């Protein structure tokens, strides 16, 4: 009997470790002009969506931020207007930080007013944002291959030679970054540890699951499930049909939100743990 219990426990453990994911589409919201990034606001049960509404590298004043309800209905299409090419977002102390080409905006979530405009010297294509527990902002520049650090509204280069630096995420006070076709962990001494490599296209959005696995999107239309040991498989491959830009994940609901960029929509997928 004891042996049977041990065998059963082995298979349960093996199954958990071998667990794969799949996606089931829940809803899609259209008529969102060039959505680049989605951010879950758990307290308000809403989604922030950065809208480029034009070219991703031009200061044209067409960009903005929309708010969706949790069911995908549009709460406020024009919550913030007059930005250029807004991309990655993060919230700290009720301030929404938004990367926009060469500046980072701080937007008061209660009033929708821009209360901070932080210039990032020599920046060209600021892309994603992550904020640590101390409120220090980190922002990637995909074109200059750098990660910048913003503290007390002052910007400085934190790390350079990070090829096509894009998606950022703090996990247990450690910074992870998508660098071209790789997922890297940046140590406290700025040493780099390779977590995964061989992404078919350059990485864009980065999210983490409760079990420590990652979900990674590639702008070209691929979404991966990546395990801490670097093994990966495709959850979605829609290349040539739509983009999969800077994703967001609601761990409580197990829902993945995907901005489709040129598809002008946001798609919600249920994440199934098989």
Which residues are covered by each model-predicted region?
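Beta-rich, blade/repeat-based domains predominating
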Residues: 32-44, 61-62, 80-94, 121-137, ...
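Short loop/turn segments that connect beta-strands within beta-propeller blades
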Residues: 68-72, 108-113, 150-154, 187-191, ...
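Residue-level marker for isolated small/hydroxyl-bearing positions within beta-strands
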Residues: 50, 99, 140, 178, ...
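Short glycine/acidic-enriched loop and turn motifs that connect beta-strands
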Residues: 53-57, 103, 144-145, 182-184, ...
């Amino acid at each position: 009997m004891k042996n049977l219990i041990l065998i059963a426990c082995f298979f349960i453990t093996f199954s958990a470790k071998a667990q794969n994911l799949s996606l089931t589409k829940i809803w899609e919201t259209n008529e969102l002009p060039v959505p680049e990034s989605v951010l879950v606001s758990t307290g308000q049960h809403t989604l922030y969506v950065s809208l480029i509404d034009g070219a991703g590298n031009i200061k044209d004043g067409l960009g903005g931020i929309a708010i969706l309800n949790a069911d995908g209905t549009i709460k406020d299409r024009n919550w913030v207007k007059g930005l250029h090419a807004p991309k990655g977002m993060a919230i700290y102390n009720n301030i929404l930080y938004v990367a926009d080409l060469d500046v980072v905006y701080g937007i008061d979530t209660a009033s929708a007013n821009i209360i901070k405009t932080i210039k990032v010297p020599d920046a060209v294509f600021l892309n994603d944002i992550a904020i640590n527990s101390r409120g220090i902002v980190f922002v990637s520049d995909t074109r200059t291959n750098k990660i910048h650090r913003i503290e007390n509204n002052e910007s400085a280069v934190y790390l350079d030679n990070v090829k096509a630096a894009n998606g950022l995420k703090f996990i247990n006070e450690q910074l992870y970054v998508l660098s071209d076709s790789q997922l890297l962990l940046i140590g406290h001494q700025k040493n780099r540890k390779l977590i995964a490599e061989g992404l078919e296209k350059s990485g864009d959005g980065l999210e983490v699951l409760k079990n420590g696995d990652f979900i990674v999107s590639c702008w070209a239309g691929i979404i991966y499930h990546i395990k801490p040991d670097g093994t990966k498989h495709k959850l979605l491959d829609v290349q040539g049909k739509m983009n999969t830009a800077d994703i967001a994940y609601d761990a409580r609901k197990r829902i993945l939100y995907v901005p489709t960029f040129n598809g002008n929509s946001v798609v919600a997928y249920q994440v199934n743990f098989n």
